[in-house]
């Protein structure tokens, strides 16, 4: 699972997921999976989508993960009274804005890449779209 090796502070405020995305262009591979909606991806979802793609392309080509879960999400145990401090870190998420490229792929045909990204998109809680690299 993806998570930071070390952080200055263990716990983080909830914050808001507003604004525009960085990393909106396909830069490493030929094809990409771009987020249309706004939300957050957990480390488990990122890994599940990566596995689905890797299995479908049968380890040919190359896959880049363009997102990293760097925000800790805490929760208190069940049946615990309010107060007594913030809960423990349960999992890590990455906040996604519309237009962010989530995954990139190279070395496979467009048809195979489309199928692989469709399988990956089924594992994600966001609406996504298939994009290709634009040559300037």
Curated annotation (Swiss-Prot):
Alphabetically sorted, this entry's keywords are: Ribonucleoprotein, Ribosomal protein, RNA-binding, rRNA-binding, tRNA-binding
Q: Which GO terms describe its cellular component?
A: cytosolic large ribosomal subunit
Which GO BP terms apply? translation
Q: Which domain of life is it from?
A: Bacteria
A Pfam family:
Ribosomal_L16
GO molecular function terms noted in the UniProt entry: rRNA binding; structural constituent of ribosome; tRNA binding
Q: What does this protein do?
A: Binds 23S rRNA and is also seen to make contacts with the A and possibly P site tRNAs.
Family membership:
Belongs to the universal ribosomal protein uL16 family.
Tell me, how does this one assemble?
A: Part of the 50S ribosomal subunit.
Protein name per the record: Large ribosomal subunit protein uL16
